[in-house]
């Protein structure tokens, strides 16, 4: 069996970042494989999230905070200065496009093809060729042309998604996995340091999955048996990382 990783955000900011990362991974998958009309679902979800909230200020604050921390680490001995320099350069480059006032994805509102599709995609079964003949035409295009179109649409969100990827990488790198045991399927942890993310790695052969709850200083993990859909009463060995 394989080891599965489960992540639980402990604040709203990381929750938003993880949702954006999830959509970004779907977008990248659609660039490599022809998923037909399904490729539009993550694109339209990203459009909606970007319209609801302008993440720019929050991301810029996070970039500045990490740059300050990385600069302090540069002065220490016994650290990987090359890796720190790579992150500083990447964050500095990712910061520049965020200075522009334009809202992410706003230009797609002017795209008549995208706008027509988006209105229909929220309706069950409304992607038939008699509802959206323009979609039927687009889907029949050669894969290379569709790929080029899709890449141009995604590009409107890269100024947001690129720094999100970097910030989550840095968050995850703050903790390594340690061995842990959930006695009777339950584990509770606490931390004097404010936590942002709990990561659980568990072997699928256990036949269970974790449900994680908590806040920045305390969290609880219940393991649930998948087949019975009830809390496990067995001791479960797993790996745990608590990221700040």
Curated annotation (Swiss-Prot):
Pfam families, per the entry:
ZapD (PF07072)
State a GO cellular component annotated for this protein: cell division site
Q: Which SUPFAM superfamilies match?
A: YacF-like
InterPro entries annotated for this entry? Answer: ZapD, ZapD_C, ZapD_sf
- Coiled coil (residue ranges): none
The entry's keywords: Cell cycle, Cell division, Cytoplasm, Septation
List locations, semicolon-separated: Cytoplasm
Keyword Oxidoreductase belongs to the record: no
Q: What processes in GO biological process is this protein linked to?
A: division septum assembly; FtsZ-dependent cytokinesis
Q: How does it assemble?
A: Interacts with FtsZ.
Stated family: Belongs to the ZapD family.
What the entry lists under PANTHER family is as follows: CELL DIVISION PROTEIN ZAPD
Chain's role: Cell division factor that enhances FtsZ-ring assembly. Directly interacts with FtsZ and promotes bundling of FtsZ protofilaments, with a reduction in FtsZ GTPase activity.
Query: What name is this protein filed under?
Result: Cell division protein ZapD
Gene name per UniProt = zapD
């Amino acid at each position: 069996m394989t080891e599965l990783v489960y992540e639980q955000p402990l604040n709203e900011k990381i929750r938003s970042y993880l949702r954006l990362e999830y959509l970004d991974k779907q977008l990248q998958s659609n660039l490599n494989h022809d998923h037909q009309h399904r490729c539009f679902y993550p694109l339209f979800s990203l459009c909606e999230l970007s319209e609801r909230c302008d993440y720019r200020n929050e991301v810029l604050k996070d970039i500045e905070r990490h740059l300050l921390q990385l600069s302090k680490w540069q002065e220490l001995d016994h650290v990987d200065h090359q890796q720190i320099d790579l992150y500083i350069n990447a964050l500095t480059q990712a910061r520049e496009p965020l200075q522009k006032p334009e809202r992410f994805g706003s230009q797609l509102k002017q795209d008549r093809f995208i706008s027509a599709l988006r209105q229909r995609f929220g309706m069950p079964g409304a992607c038939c060729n008699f509802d959206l003949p323009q979609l039927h035409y687009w889907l029949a295009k050669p894969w290379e042309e569709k790929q080029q179109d899709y890449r141009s649409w995604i590009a409107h969100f890269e100024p947001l998604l690129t720094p999100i990827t970097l910030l989550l990488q840095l968050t995850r790198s703050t903790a390594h996995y340690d061995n842990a045991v959930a006695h009777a399927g339950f584990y509770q942890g606490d931390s004097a340091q404010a936590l942002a993310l709990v990561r659980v790695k568990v072997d699928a052969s256990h036949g269970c999955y974790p449900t994680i709850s908590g806040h920045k200083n305390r969290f609880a993990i219940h393991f649930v048996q998948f087949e019975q859909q009830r809390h496990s009463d067995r001791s479960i060995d797993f790996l745990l990382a608590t990221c700040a």
